[in-house]
Amino acid sequence: MSNNPPLRFSHSHHLLSVKGCDAGLDVLAFEGDEALSTPFSYRTEFTSADHAISKEMMLMKAASLTLQAPVDQGYGIKIQQPVRVIQGVVTGFERLGTSKDETRYAVTLEPRLALLSRSHQNAVYQDMSVPQIVEKILRERHGMRGQDFLFSLSKEYPRREQVMQYAEDDLHFITRLLGEVGIWFRFTTDTRLNIDVVEFYDSQQGYEKGLTLPSVPPSGQHSQGVDSVWDMECHHNVVQKAVSTRDYNYRQASEDMNTRVDATRGDVTTYGEAYHWADNYLT
């Protein structure tokens, strides 16, 4: 008997794979959100002839979504080439409907860092820099190892006397600390280990500048296989008129640390004030 997995034919260009699940998963549709310093989230709908896929088979399992371009038309056997592979962990599972032939499901794929939002803690960190605090949380509280994250920083960060985490989930806590000192993060895929990797940076060295995209509305036109803009919208909202900050430094008690600024420069469509006390900015 052959040990090779069975070959399954699928009309979908994309592939969904969940560790430990041998059922055929035929991708029906997907949508994703990505941004810097925010865990990505991909919701993927799929069908399967297996009517008994359970939440235990999906949740907390390593998974990947492989995006592939359509094959060129013509004679001969064509092999699809992966355009991108998104690695992560399944954090959501849905059973959407069923018929005699197949059942429709959906899963939510996120990086492992997103699981930190499920961990609320109260803790005190002393004599540690922000990168050291983040690494301590990743290693000791969430079991991550060196291959799971990467710090590529151009500056040295001072140790802080004391940092408190109070009734705050780990993801929000480290994102807040990193944002205070100008460190941002993104996610990549280690194709050798088949894992998602979070990378931390503090410079614009990796930014691509001067990029242009054609505007190609989808009304009877096509993008000819290149990235293009389909639509543009403009939204306006009322925002706060001014920002006020106050603080006190016992080492420099006579120092005036009260400030107020009109961030809108006189815009009459604004309202209200944002007041901040003791934001722990270094002075």
Where are these regions (language model features)?
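Amphipathic alpha-helical and helix-coil boundary elements used as assembly
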Residues: M1-T283
